[in-house]
Amino acid sequence: MERNDSLKRVLSCLADRNLGGALTELRNFFALYSQPQAEAELEPLLAEYQMMSNYWKRGYKDPQLEANFNRLLQRTCQLYADTSRWRRIMASPFMSTVYSSLAQQPREWSVANIRQELEAYVSDVAMVSLEPANKQKTHLQELNTRHLKSMSQLFDYLWTSRHWSDATAQAFEEMLLSPTVDATDQQLMISAMTLSLLNTFDMAKFRVLVHVYRQALVEAVRQRALVGWVMGRSYTMTIVFPEEQQLVNEMMEDEAIRRELLELQIQFLYTVNAESDTAKIQSEIMPDLLKNNHFRITRNGVEEVEEDSLEDILHPEADEERMERVEESFRKMIDMQKEGSDIYFGGFSQMKRFPFFHRMCNWFMPFSMTHPEVTETLSTIQHNRFLQQVLRKGPFCNSDKYSFVFAFSQVLERMPQSMRDLMEQGEAAIEVVDDEESVTPTYVRRMYLQDLYRFFRLFAHTSQFDHPFKTGESELGQVLFFASPLFRNTKLELYYDKLGTMLLRRKRYEDLRTLMKNQGESHRTYSYYMLAATAIRNTKEPMDSKVRLEGILENYRNALNLNPFAEKAMQGEARILLEMERYEEAIATYDHLIAINPDKQSYVLNRAVCLESLERYEEALKPLFRLNYEQPDDVNVSRVLAWTLLGVGKYEQALTLYEKLTTVEQAAAEDFLNQGYCMWLTGNVQGAIESFRHYIKETGEPAINIINNEERMLSKKGISNEEMQMMYDAIAP
């Protein structure tokens, strides 16, 4: 999507409420790219700003200054939006072709005329139903063909439209809520408005979508409006149009809306995973289905096809095992779909090259068997019971149903007769969606999101639009709309914990941190602080290690302020204190943890690590001996005990443990290192050299670190600097 540096500077000024700067940058832009109509709109804005500025400079106190300034700022923003739109149209062959085609139409684009045409269509359809049966089909086809052409033009007009006046917005809102306008037409208009908002924010269109969402009685219309205002929300213009924030704040007082937004956010996450889900199906599920394809699918499920009996004699259990694997593969896919995965994207993405999808509005068209561009195709196959079942009850989005019609018509004649008979009789089994579920808000919204995702991923000219499903390598970006500043300090934050838990389960730590950073202090709960600590610990954001650890510790302590006896938070605090080498504080926390759960081995062991780090070896030995007695084969206990024994000078006992640790399968390199120290202190220099070399070979650690890391301990144990240098010379590669 084309962007212009001059217009970026205008946008930056507007985001800073720098009205004078925005007007100046617009004037500079028009000096480079002449646009007479827009320049004519700029002149009165410049004049009004100059007049306002002159009065202010003379010391006049205008009680209307703030209101006038804000109105002028909004008008300037609208001019910027229209100019940005014009610039994109001129820079895009696709958009300029659409725009030129609309300009050549003799059609009047007034709202009154549009509404009259839409209502006339509904009336005409009703009249056709009163005609003789032998005429109805032809007349309805002619009527639908004209209407499709009209709606296609209206769709293009809306997504390329300028900003709306309040009067225009009000008229469109009434049209979108009117029972005298066909719901399919209303849905198409909302989709076109969404595309327009994605390219350039328009407060009037945003307001219309919010109002339609809150007032529409047709669920499909309502859900498209919801998706539309969420996708089309502004990231920068709230400071210019505070009404946007006011509308959002009002909605966030409604618990039902908050719940619906949480559902939508989760559905967004599943939607953008369509391609990874496809990859999972192809790599993990389809191989089993293809490998075990000695079955057919009927209305009764998976049934066996007769095979050569020799295999049955040699391997009587093989068929049953194959059946189980096939059924398990199907269950995996069904489970993925029930969770919200778009499991059909991979297959249907190959079916979007039909001429039907050259018409842009068809990507958003609710499925209808009377669509004039599918009626001819359906005329020869519409009585196929399998097809009827797919189109009426199949779990497919509208776009995929249209794809299925065209693909099915091409392959039907090439199918084996036995398979065609099965389909004609309606015995080929597919997963069906019951009527009750198909009209639920959740299902309606999911299908629409799949339609949108297919458009933005597969439409030939999708680069002309801001991609609402675009994600980074490790971040969801704008897909994570819960992290939008619009929702900060609103009651939507009451649902951040639920979403955060889901992000945590999916190991989306960067996104979890982004979400947590957006949450205001008033709604921060125990769960918030625990999630925030986990996010910081697992993100790769470059920051000073000490600052990072302090941030984690602060979150754990904030969690404990809200729930002083929370073992998880206390455990996190102790672990971070240990990592920060604040051993005294860590010991105090582990004392509390052991009081809560005295049988938890990790608490006792980590407390002992703190004690030995403080060189309080004797104090650490007693609990370590107990643990070693109870768990003689636990390598972690043996490892800590061995180092503690080394600390108190009981080298032989330590060596016994290190001998055991270094002879187990897949011995840890660290144990060879510590064994080397122990051997050195007992005078077995050659053994120490061999252990150190083994450690260096395994880890690539510089030889000098072996000396430097434990220089203090070695000196206290009587190893001289000269001996240390000689050891370095002996082990250095």
What residue spans do the PLM features occupy?
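Structural motif corresponding to the intra-repeat A-B loop/turn of tetratricopeptide repeats
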Residues: 16, 506, 539-540, 546, ...
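Short coil turns that delineate tetratricopeptide repeat
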Residues: 34, 523-524, 564, 598, ...
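Start-of-helix register in tetratricopeptide repeats
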Residues: 224, 494, 527, 568, ...
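Alpha-solenoid helical-repeat scaffolds
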Residues: 365-568, 572-575
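Canonical positions in the second alpha-helix
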Residues: 518-519, 558-559, 592-593, 626-627, ...
